[in-house]
Every structure is written in structure tokens, then in C-alpha cells.
């Protein structure tokens, strides 16, 4: 995502298209409607100075960044056809947290890529533990026909891949629950995504700026009226797992 525009011709005024410029243009469009811009699937090498400053300085762009690293070990990344290392990734995330205070970070880790040793698996585990990402998706490597990885002879045994995956899942669940709980006590806008009916009554389901729809949990509101698409102001009063409990703020509060 971050390198969007690099394969496009310059504009009429001689500017090279970039994701940052596109985000600035979209921000102008959504500004009158108080819209949010959330950018997902940014690659580490695409995090340019221009992009970081645009995320920091454009109010419509949420301070939420999804950078799926897959791994942090340099050798494994090279085998994946990716660049980077633990130290380079550490420096990137340190910079992001410094330049965009309060930001939320999402990433992805892959377990059991061909040739991954116990030590390299531990390196990924330790890095994710160190970084305390707000959200981390974890996947088990699965060979796909025709890919470079599928042709590698040093496939990791399934039972080892499953063990490494479960170990990392246990970690990111703990980190995620703690990160979600940090938002208890905040007052923020919630976009209503749906309305659920049950024997216990009606519940509004929505998401906040720090929750990407359909992957980062939701806000559950037991009392109040709103339609899908409405934006309501809520107090976040409790959390469970990745979910939040919200109470709609009265207009007079």
C-alpha cells in the first residue's frame, strides 16, 4: 500500500503520485462529513517521511497503522522475498510511536515458514512481546502450489508449526486484552455497524477509531437508540477480551 503510485506517470503539474498525496486529497473530500481515513496493509519499506507526516498532521487520517511484518528475522524475511531485520523494524516502530503519540499499531506474524528454526521462531515471539502491539494476527504457514516457499525442501513439520502458532497466539491474546483495557474510561465517537436482537433486548454494535471493522473487536451498547451508520458519542466503561462496553453520552452531558 505504501508504495502506491510508484508505477504511475507524473501528474500534469509534474508531481509523482504517492499514497500520502492521495490521502491528503481524500481528506479534503471527507472533511465536511467528519469522515475517517484508515490505512491498512502498509509495508515497512513504504513508510516514507511524507507518509508518516501525513498520518501525523492530517486530522481525518486515524493514528492507526497496520504494518504486517510477517517475521522479523532477517534470514527468514529474505527467504520470503522481503527486506528488513529485527533492528530495522524496531527503529521504525520506535519512530512511529515518537512522531505519532498515542497511535495504535496492528501487525501480522507468520509461524513455520520453511527453514524457520526454533531460535528464529523465538526471535519473532520476543519481538512481538517487546513491541506490545495493540493487535496482532497470527497465521500458520501453508504452502501454496507454484510459490517459492512451496518448492523449498526444508518444510517445517506440521506439529511444530501448530505448536509455534499456538504459543504466539497465547501471547498476542494477552497483549491485545491489555491494550483494549487501556481504553476503558475514554469518551469517543462510535460508528454504529449493526443492531442485534436477542431475548435480553436490543444491542447496538459499533467500532471506534482504534478498532478496524471486522477484525479488532467492537463496542457493545446495551441502551440507547441509533441507526446503522450513525456516529454516537460514548463512554467506554468496560472491556472483555477485544470487546468494549459503551454507554451513549446524553447530549446534555
Language-model segments: residues:
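Short beta-alpha junctions and helix-cap segments that line functional grooves
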Residues: 51-52, 124, 220-222
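C-terminal, non-catalytic macromolecule-binding modules
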Residues: 119, 123-162, 168
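Conserved, mostly hydrophobic/aromatic
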Residues: 39, 67, 108, 128, ...
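Short, cationic motifs built from Arg/Lys/His that form the positively charged side of catalytic pockets
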Residues: 82, 97, 144, 161-164, ...
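Short, small-residue-rich loop/turn micro-motifs
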Residues: 2, 68-73, 140-145, 208-210
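Conserved SAM/AdoMet-binding glycine-rich loop
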Residues: 1-121, 129-130
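Terminal RNA-binding accessory module
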Residues: 151-253
